[in-house]
Amino acid sequence: SLFGILSTLWSELTFSNYARLLTDTPFLRWMLNSLIVSALAASVAVTVTTLAGYAFARFRFPGRKYGLLVMILLQMFPAGMAMVAVFRLLQVMGQATGGWIGLNSLLGLSLVYIGGGIPFKTWMIKGYIDSLPKELEESAYLDGATPHQTFRQIILPLLGPILAVVTVFNFITPYSDFIFPSVLMQSGDRYTLAVGMQGFVSGNFSANWSLFAAASILGSLPILALFFSVQRFLVQGLTQGAVKG
């Protein structure tokens, strides 16, 4: 009886929806746009937050305390509150740069995610660096290492687990977001994957759930690839301190 029920749910196995998705819709264009925005946002944000987190954790300078406080305060407000300001800012930047950075620009959209992800991720990396013993750096200084060499050769290799987490966060957020791209992207060839997929099911009487499901499966592949590529760093972070000695 179980097989009889299953046969009524899936009466026929077909891959025709994948073929239609790839040939009759700009799905690949949408996915490429999402990958460009996500990769750019993740790479820049990880670089900036790593340097900022190290500076806040290891150096004492004027404005350090207030800088950390401002980053906490920025996280108290939802991103949607800044929608009008971001829209107007990109509108002005688009006029000033000839459209390179502005509305309907992948670079402009990337900058939105870069700016939005820096405060919280900086705190994450700072907290992780605070847990590392300062004696490691002091030993390197005694051996004649410069601050740059100490960071690059001593600290950076130890940041694998937290950098993996920050990279995943900074990649998934722009890749799956719908609100900002739907407002800032104004032409179909600039849509990200989430905005494009919404068009499959937005009609009251023409929702195409088959194409939507096929797009969901294919759209999840980059996320899976990213998780598998950083899996060993995530596991390393989870198991640190689990074994004594």
Feature roles, as predicted:
Residues 1-245:
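A structural signal for multi-pass alpha-helical bundles of membrane permease subunits
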